[in-house]
Amino acid sequence: MSHPINVFSEIGKLKTVMLHRPGKELENLMPDYLERLLFDDIPFLEKAQAEHDAFAELLRSKDIEVVYLEDLAAEALINEEVRRQFIDQFLEEANIRSESAKEKVRELMLEIDDNEELIQKAIAGIQKQELPKYEQEFLTDMVEADYPFIIDPMPNLYFTRDNFATMGHGISLNHMYSVTRQRETIFGQYIFDYHPRFAGKEVPRVYDRSESTRIEGGDELILSKEVVAIGISQRTDAASIEKIARNIFEQKLGFKNILAFDIGEHRKFMHLDTVFTMIDYDKFTIHPEIEGGLVVYSITEKADGDIQITKEKDTLDNILCKYLHLDNVQLIRCGAGNLTAAAREQWNDGSNTLAIAPGEVVVYDRNTITNKALEEAGVKLNYIPGSELVRGRGGPRCMSMPLYREDL
């Protein structure tokens, strides 16, 4: 592989993918603090891990290399200097107000000799009771005395799609919607700065976690070697799309058109890929609830290097035909178009498919009506269980970050 990253489509045969196996961070979820951590329910860890292992094994059975974020992050801590730098940065972004408490956490983390154990600890979160003689020094600490964590867990991390996104040979290292998830992007920073697989190699960055406006990978879809679709959503700002479009054009990644899909700000469809995914050259899943009010903007580069933004005035299928150079496209509706089934199965990520080859996808087995519609459209389905993983509000695409796809 001349480039460590090669993603010029949503559907090219998947060769390498990054996952995160859920761990103790899920056991640090508590009913009183679910909203703070962007969860609606508490998955049963043992079952969630079994479901995730089934997902990984299915991918391996298709000759796909599976790498884990936690392993790459541990391997990126290549020496003691980088290791200490990681700990210092992690603590600076952990919102610990008390300097003495921060120093106790630093000592705790420095005492962990094994890098993989250190990464797992950073992901799981740290409870106040783990610190010797924890003292409340600030009014905020006293008001939040009942809150059990000095560092919040990262239960959303098994959705590896979001904290960065691969584009062509490059990446978008994202600025996340919430403080809870922003720390997740530290792992991506160290992986791409220091891991031997990527360090010193051509991996251009079209967005950086230090930017002031938010964007998440669930809103970033690579429709072709010329077209990127990005959702304007609960998690991604329009301003971020302008920034990333300029960077994509300036860095000559090969993409000529950025399509911005305005899907509104809703928890139930927080990202574009929860309501729209590409599954074949001319086939797409879509949640019918977004169709009526969907507005699409095209962003192109002008001759002077500035960007041109145009509001598209056609139907979604015609817009897709225009930019993907197709005669026809097929929009396969979640729930087969039935409003009740569509709402239920979209909530359970029926639209969130992962294409592993043109016309072949991974889906949750629970979304029976949508799955039947996909099969009737000639799509090959690979089923995984999802009774626990889905409680985090994400499906197969959310849980995977392609690092390498074959070109179409």
UniProtKB/Swiss-Prot annotation:
The keyword NAD does not apply. Its EC number is 3.5.3.6. Keywords: Arginine metabolism, Cytoplasm, Hydrolase. It catalyses: L-arginine + H2O = L-citrulline + NH4(+). The active site is at 398 (amidino-cysteine intermediate). Pathway: Amino-acid degradation; L-arginine degradation via ADI pathway; carbamoyl phosphate from L-arginine: step 1/2. Signal peptide: none annotated. The keyword Cytoplasm applies. Gene3D superfamilies: Arginine deiminase, L-arginine/glycine Amidinotransferase, Chain A. It holds the Pfam family ADI. GO terms for biological process: arginine catabolic process to ornithine; arginine deiminase pathway. Its main location: cytoplasm. It comes from the Bacteria. GO terms for cellular component: cytoplasm. It is found in: Cytoplasm. GO terms for molecular function: arginine deiminase activity. It is an enzyme of class 3 (hydrolase). Belongs to the arginine deiminase family. This is Arginine deiminase. The lineage of its organism: Bacteria, Bacillati, Bacillota, Bacilli, Lactobacillales.
